[in-house]
Amino acid sequence: MAAPANASSKKDHVIPVLLNECSIDSPSFRASMYYLGNQIKAFNEWSHDFLCCCNKFIESIMAIEPIVASMSLNAMPSNVASGFFDPDYATTALLHGQDLFRSSYMVQLQQAKNLRKFIVAPLDLFRDSKVKPLLQLNDRFKAEQAKYDAEVLRYSSLGHSKDLSQMRDEAKSLYEARKSYFTVALQYVVRVTSFRSSIDFIVIESICKFSIETFRLTDRLHESNRHINDQLIRLLSYETKLKESYPSLKRIVSNVFDRIEKEILKRVQPPTNLDAYRFDPQQICQTNATKRQGWLLRNISSSKADNKAIWRKYWFFVDNGYVGYLINDANGGVFESEKIGVLLCKFSVLPSNHRKFCFQIKTKSVSYILQAETHMEMLEWGSVINNAREHCINSGISANRILSPTLPSFSAKATSIINPQVNGRSNSTGKIGKNYRPRRTYSGRLLCGPNNYEVSTIMRSPTISTVPPPKYLSNSINGAKFLNPLAPWTLVNAPLITNLTHETITSLLDQEAFFHGNSPCALLANFWGSVNYGHVLERQNVYIEDLSNPSYKRLAREIHIEKLPSELKLRNAEFRGIFGESEASTVLFVCRVCSKREDQIRMPGRMYCTMKGIYIYYNINGLVLIEHFPISSILNVKQFASTKCDYFYMNIQNIGTVRFRLYLDSSKALTDRLNVLLCNYIADKPNSSIQLLSCIKRLNDDVKRFERGGDDNALKSYGVQPSQEDLLIRRGRSSRALTNLINKNESNDSFMEDLRDFKIAMLPKETVQVVRSHHLDDIVFDRVYNVSTKALFHIVFGDRSTVLSGAYNLHGVDDVEFLPWGKDPKTNLSRRYINYKVYNYDQEGQCQSYHYEDCQIMDVRNDYHLYIMTWLHHSWTLPYRDYFKIVTKTSISHLRREKSRLLISVGLEWIVKPFAISKVIEAECRKLAIKYIKTEVNFLEKATRRARNQPLIAIINQYGRVGDYNESMVYRRKIPFNCELKNLSIIDIIRNNWWLFLQGLAIDLLKLPWAVFHIFLRYLFSHSFLVIIFACSVILNLSLMFCFGAKYWDERQNNKFVGQVFDEFKNIETSARYVYMKDVDDLLVGLPTYLHPNVTYPSECLQSFALKSSPQKSHWLRKRNYIAEKRKKILENLASLNYYEYIIHEDAVYQYIQQELLGCDKAREFDLYPPSMQRYCDSCTQDWRNRTLFFGKDTLATRLLTLETVENADYAA
């Protein structure tokens, strides 16, 4: 379909059938009409033969047995079955009906009347009311199509010599023919959609009612057919629900068709302006499109004269830098030409006396002489080709060669002839008859037609030979004994389905949609193309990173088609045909579900379950809906069964509960298999898709052994086709959700044991003891949390957890980069490196940056049992920082259900141990490590409190899986941290820990050789040593008094006083909060944010103050707003000051706040306070004076500025 001038590339993928080539007047549409007419005729012939057999059966009672046998074995033709019958419900009912025909009538021959009542009469009425009118409409459509093509050719043959008014009359004549053709085509579309639904209704209703009546009238039915009764009841319930929702669905479809018809007729109407029909070679088309498609007339006899040339209609396209065309085959197929790069093409306008609007696309080897319908259309083709050429040059696309069509971009590949035809009918036996002549094979061409739809389905999986015919499927299903409860063989050839959604239909009415010229809409090709035609995406090479420790994302992307059984190969080919290669993942099992939509609409569909998540495809009456639920968003699943259907519920994060009904499959089996996927997702060492298939097979075999009493010899392989009798396995009510599944060991012990066999760990039954050797000597933290070990592990060490990044930010780190996890080749343990950068100011005031690298090692990772993590950290604030690393070991062990134990120990790893000062450095490192631990504990208290009532999957989604990211994660500070780091000197450390210094000195001295130690002792107790010590002390005191004097000792005393005040800050945090919230300021402007306890009636006082108006109050409010803005800037400046800078600015800050308090006293002079507020203001003023010094230290100011946060205030500080 031709793209408009302003079509955006965003909508190119919305209608992906045949390069968005889905108009009513297109090759796919015409091929669909041809294919549809054959199917209608085949169905008419089959129904006629079927009714004749039924009448013979009724009339010939004595010959009842052979007639019943021939009727039950009369297989549906493949072209009819794949075209009309639903592959899940209608064909299942049909097969069950065939079995019951044979068994039930052999018991009671009196059921002939019921046969006439429930089957013959409805089908006969259906043929008269539905099939015959549709055949007549088909003939009418062919006549209108021939008339329309003839009119187009006649109109195109007009030359330039014609009068313009006559050309306008001819255009109107062409418009009438086109209008009649499009009207009939749209009527055909509407009738087709109702026709297919009517067939499903009549088949399901007739056969189900007849079968149920059969069970009621006889007690001597064959014992092997009793299980069919339950499923037929479910099918009838499904048909009833579907029939109830059909009026609402039909109303929606009719409204869409009416809107599309009006829009089509409006857009294809020819212009009335005569200038539109005038040839002007100087005119330029303004368009930025690089893609276009539509009908063009091609001169296929360029050697002849213009008046004798032969012109044919071709569907040309420009896409992805290539030019090509499609053409219809006489048998209803669509073939594609070889594609030519636009860089090799040259566009030129051809003036012609016999043809108007002609142009040429020429290369070195081929030349296309083409004719457009209008002058503007010709100019648009030229502009699109030039734009596509410029796009290839600018983007570096090498679209400059001729491509062979062996790798198609939008059609199926014809590698062989599937289902050979004999005398116009399919040879179901698979043998080639005498009169069979092989059809001509088209080498180098692409086939998309009724003879090739099987290739379209299986081309994505090279290991699938072909799809068995329906008869073979029927025999294989009846012959097998045991059944895989989900995803039985599709009874017809699997369709290749496109993404036609409600958004597609909506976009058809958009101004930027692909309506243009003679390409009006995209409807029937999408609808019918969803069965036998379709958009086959090119296979994309998915890059999988080479990691020694594969993550869940990598395992989910791995595809092992060759290792799958034949049934799953077919399901995977079908899945990639629907969802494309972008959602590439191995389909593990498929389930048929039915979902409820708006206006009581029931949407039947298939649920494809993969490691990535659940994909659901719904298709009814031409409307398609696609849903996707990632595996990470599924919190839990549950199911219960009833007589008419099974109910299956999924709790989806941020969405709620999604409800489904299962009529053919078992919700119990579906729940068990999804629980396997969910457990594998949260496992620390997830399994691959092949391992999960083995686990699912084990679960299925256990259920079969339980039902049969443990007959192991009767088990079949996973790929063997099962029978229908195992479809209804145990349907007991199940309340297992994911949280119960991983925590409750008492229920379903065999299920748990199977999960353990396949390395899907579950909750331990006993307390896990941590070996003392796993920790360092100094254990500084030991606490029990009311969450599971896995939940606590992800809260602390998850990829999105902020525990570690917050600890770095607390100590002034600006940039932190967490590298991906990898394997240590020496220890074979998982580890990751952490790079970060800190800033420091030298003595000249220049900012210097320092880079450090820490390491995190995962020592033990045992699912639900024990986790041990080691953190090697550089302390950049301590001297000799390159001589050691701080080691912090964290262990999380299982205590009991929903309880875990957290142990943290700290130590030092010396690279080079210095003399005499190792003890004091160890003490300072312990203090620093305890600060980190306090930050972690404050965060864990709040995080575990929130996670107590959350499911495990929600916790993993919030904090991230451990080691599941493949690229570095970088965290940057949101608030600039431009302060100078407080680096401790070795003298300060020794002065604060002098006793530990003496111990370290003594220990290191004892390690010295005895001769050196003897000389040191003699000098230590000599007279010269004491004189030297006395002289040094005198010089030190004199230098201190000379350099600092009394001011030094005053500052030191102030420092001690301020330190005491800061230690009491936590006890008076409430007072500091309302001081920061500026109660006095807000009170004066009438918007207080904090209510003081001394206020008796705050609402009345505030109301009386707000209602009082005076000039003095207005002046005061303006003045206070100005002061508040100044005060805010000072607070922001205080946030960036450190302790020493505060000492310098302390007097200025105190003076400023005192001026503010004097301003508050002036408020009383202006009589702005009601009497009832006097006590409140006095208390506020007193508290303000007492808390003045709280704005001194940087960490405290930062904390005051972030007090408005609800739960992360302490952590953000």
Swiss-Prot record:
GO annotations under biological process? endoplasmic reticulum-plasma membrane tethering
Q: Which residues cross the membrane?
A: 996-1016, 1025-1045
List the InterPro entries: AH/BAR_dom_sf, BAR_dom, PH-like_dom_sf, PH_domain, Sip3/Lam1_BAR, Sip3_PH, VASt
Nucleotide-binding among keywords: no
Note the topology in the membrane: Multi-pass membrane protein
CDD domains on file: BAR_SIP3_fungi, PH_SIP3
Q: What name goes with this protein?
A: Uncharacterized PH domain-containing protein C19A8.02
Q: Does the keyword Transmembrane helix apply?
A: yes
